[in-house]
Each structure stands twice: as C-alpha cells, then as structure tokens.
C-alpha cells in the first residue's frame, strides 16, 4: 500500500505505530479474548488504562498536583458552554478575546450564560492578518475569567505568548489544536480544554485541566454531564466514557513519551512549519496572508495565485497520497494541518509536490 499522508484538520492523522498496535490488539486485548471496546469501563483492566493515560498526560505537560485532569465528552463546543457554567460563580461577566473563528464561536455560546466583555484582538499589519500582543488586551475589572483560543485552525493564526495577567485573573483557553505540540506552563491557566481529534487521539474524547480551587462553583442549571466537580468526583466515569478513544489516546501518550515528549515534538513541529512556510514565502505562486509572528505551526492555510487551479491541485495532490488539503469553506484555498502525528517526511512530500506543481503550472 502506498504511503498516505493525511493533512486533515480533524479528525486528524494518528501515529502509524499507534494504529498498528491498536490493530494488533483489536480483537484480543490484554489476552482477554475481547476488544478493549467491549470491556467494562469500571473493570480493573480498563481502570488501569484510564489511570495510566492520566499519569502519562500529566507527565507530558508537567501538570501541577493542584490541577485535576478530566476525561470528558462534548468536544470543544461542549466546553464553550461548560466553562461559563462552571467558572462564572456569582459573577455575570467574563472577558473573551476574539482572534478568529473558534474564539468567536465560544463567545456566541457564552452569551447564553453571561454578558461577555469582548476584546477584538484582530489587526492587519502590512496587509497581513495578525493579533494584538497580550499587553494590549483590555480586560475588565469584574470578570470571572478571561477566555482565548491559542490556535485558530481555520484562520491559521496562533497566539504563542504565555499569559501573565496576574494571579487574580483566571485564564481559560481552548487548546484543542495545539495541545501537546509545545511546552506550556499549566500554572498560568485556570482551565485548559482540548478536543482529542487533533493532537490527542480519536474524536469523542475531550480533556479538561482545571485548577482545583475552581471546582464546586457550577451554576445550579449546569447539566451534570458538563459539571467539572461531578466528573472529578467520579473519576471521569459519571457515565460510560468513550473507552476506545480513551484507550487510543493513552497509546498516543506513550508514543509521545517514547519519542522525546513534548520538547521533541516542539522541535519537529518547528522544522515542519519552517519547511512549509519556506516554500510558500519563496514563491509567487503560493501565498499565506498571516503575519509571521502569528502564523500557526499546526494549521497552514495557503492560496494559489490562480484559484482556477485549485481543483487540479487537490486532484493531483490526492493522487500523490497527500490527502485532505482542501481549505475550510470559510476561507477557501488550501490548508495543511501538520499536527504531532504528521512526520517531517509527510511535509517534505507536500513541499516537493508544491514545487513541482508550480513548475508545471506557474
């Protein structure tokens, strides 16, 4: 079978070694004669999977002991509601920084539960899209928390600064598309959440890291399935969890640890991004309209000089084993999502194709 590189923004490519192990264990897991999908989530075998996954995740991100790690449902969109429902307490407003599509979507959901103070951080610098630095973000005095999205998958915009707003500001962040791709100082945040389907594992699982002093404040109307305290008190097994996604994510964590951890991923991700952006920047045939300081290393949108060639580019790239390069419907063009599981070899194959395509059609 020819090598296929999947550049989908999510569900995204998984490490080949992880898929191979899952395939080998699919029908007979741990010698039980059954699949991990078929065992009880409350049985000792799966409890061990759950505990190891949490330990490995904590190790990878150096999660402090005063933070709880929850394995939840509902994806990022579920957390758009869960954050205000759990963290507002008796306050009625929260600060929301708008830097792109997903931040704006979180704001729309938050308006159901509070009156958000929205700060538009989007700017244009020399004709390129950018984000105002954190020192210019205007926060209110009475907000329960401040929410932002460090990586916008559709816009291809990243905010790599570490929050430093003082100990009284509870920072909540949507790390769905950048979790585990670079080191982060968890202690600077009150809540970090991430849908699994990009850098963690299969769709269906959502991981929440929450500082323990923020528990116990849920709105009385908060659905139990979104209540952080309930999930924490029940070991993330308030109801039947997505066990297969949890198991596979655990395999990904072990793969990450065996391959140098987050620090090594950070180096490789930088190499991949530099390679791809280098081809784009050194060409008049391709373009990216994000300022270099805010370019995403995970999601690289680009356009062809002649959009009439888009269809041919997608057809030929697919035939070459480079899949899922079509840009989001909101922005069009192309998009290469190059998460942890995408090897440098895959980005090299893409850039080689891009150079050759330009040679023939430029």
From Swiss-Prot:
Pyridoxal 5'-phosphate binds at residues 76-77, 102, 153, 174, 197, 239-240. Keywords: Amino-acid biosynthesis, Aminotransferase, Cytoplasm, Pyridoxal phosphate, Pyridoxine biosynthesis, Serine biosynthesis, Transferase. CDD domains: PSAT_like (cd00611). InterPro entries: Aminotrans_V_dom, Aminotrans_V_PyrdxlP_BS, Pser_aminoTfrase, PyrdxlP-dep_Trfase, PyrdxlP-dep_Trfase_major, PyrdxlP-dep_Trfase_small. It catalyses: O-phospho-L-serine + 2-oxoglutarate = 3-phosphooxypyruvate + L-glutamate; 4-(phosphooxy)-L-threonine + 2-oxoglutarate = (R)-3-hydroxy-2-oxo-4-phosphooxybutanoate + L-glutamate. It is an enzyme of class 2 (transferase). Signal peptide: none annotated. It is found in: Cytoplasm. Its cofactor is pyridoxal 5'-phosphate. It holds the Pfam family Aminotran_5. Pathway: Amino-acid biosynthesis; L-serine biosynthesis; L-serine from 3-phospho-D-glycerate: step 2/3; Cofactor biosynthesis; pyridoxine 5'-phosphate biosynthesis; pyridoxine 5'-phosphate from D-erythrose 4-phosphate: step 3/5. Its EC number is 2.6.1.52. One of its GO terms (cellular component) is cytoplasm. L-glutamate binds at residues 9, 42. PANTHER family: PHOSPHOSERINE AMINOTRANSFERASE. Belongs to the class-V pyridoxal-phosphate-dependent aminotransferase family. SerC subfamily. Homodimer. This is Phosphoserine aminotransferase. It comes from Shigella boydii serotype 18 (strain CDC 3083-94 / BS512).
